[in-house]
UniProtKB/Swiss-Prot annotation:
Coiled coil: none annotated. The keyword Iron-sulfur does not apply. It catalyses: L-gulono-1,4-lactone + O2 = L-ascorbate + H2O2 + H(+). This is L-gulonolactone oxidase. It is a single-pass membrane protein. The gene is GULO.
Amino acid sequence: MVHGHKGVKFQNWAKTYGCCPEMYYQPTSVEEIREVLALARQQNKRVKVVGGGHSPSDIACTDGFMIHMGKMNRVLKVDMEKKQVTVEAGILLADLHPQLDKHGLALSNLGAVSDVTAGGVIGSGTHNTGIKHGILATQVVELTLLTPDGTVLVCSESSNAEVFQAARVHLGCLGVILTVTLQCVPQFHLQETTFPSTLKEVLDNLDSHLKKSEYFRFLWFPHSENVSVIYQDHTNKPPSSSANWFWDYAIGFYLLEFLLWISTFVPGLVGWINRFFFWLLFNGKKENCNLSHKIFTYECRFKQHVQDWAIPREKTKEALLELKAMLEAHPKVVAHYPVEVRFTRADDILLSPCFQRDSCYMNIIMYRPYGKDVPRLDYWLAYETIMKKVGGRPHWAKAHNCTRKDFEKMYPAFRKFCAIREKLDPTGMFLNAYLEKVFY
């Protein structure tokens, strides 16, 4: 029989959201999860499944039953002929990478953070960059879903296809993802080339940059014209790195955190800090080569608040210039660097922010130096206004102020997803406060 724990406090990685579930479970088998769901049905409790806890919002929070999938973390099957791997949903991508390395395989695209689970990373619509590549969930070829009534559904394009179309970005509201089968590619190395540019140059030549590099993104430093362009492309060069502890940590983390803390008393310093650190750390060309997963992912050092919306790719220039103009017109509104801009191809996943359109993701950030919150409301609201104006859709894992009315306008298939959810979970067992705002 599965045993739960009382008094466990859950906090997300950034320590910006937390909750105290009534019971906290760490099941080791499907039968143990079934027991938790049966208990929840008997006691009329809500259930939330969590993985790595990296979502910077309350999407994972509940005061009911919490299921942590960390003990269901095995690689179940590697199909070398199809280049596919089947894993339990609780496996961290950081633990999957070395397993794929052993078989000469890799995932074709990854997000920046690998301390996330296979089930969670697809459920929130996690993405990287590359206009020829989709969000991470597009690499899923099959998944198994345990529904609230205890039924296991095997879902793919040929089996339970409608549920599959919904469950690849499931928001944790359809049931418990048990296993995920991912389409891999042969192991490959990437060369990352970083060089300075300007916002005008990048926006004027956006199509050219997108063609030049398979995984192109750029970082804009607000309160300036400064941009750091990042190309990542296949290479046969041996691993090499320009990493340096003094510049990456002593300057890029410790000094930056101290100066950002000072700026909470003198907000006008933020523009100077952005320009100073661009000059200090980003004003020259750098190259790194390594296995793909070591280039895609990087250490996320700062606790932070973020927003990340996907807009139609053709609206990139308009939206960024409007954000820049807003900051220039309102000097008391400050914005930490960077605004990270990435690109992703269209897909057919019902609640994917890239549903039926090539997209540009525009991620804004406000750090929490020494855990201190920095005023961000004016920046947040202005950004959201611009994103909505150009047809944006918010990242599901990240905080936003949207409601069902907004999502019905944003997503052509929103009502179809709702119908699937209501059929699978008619009592709302897998809802929480975050999801109630989405669906009601």
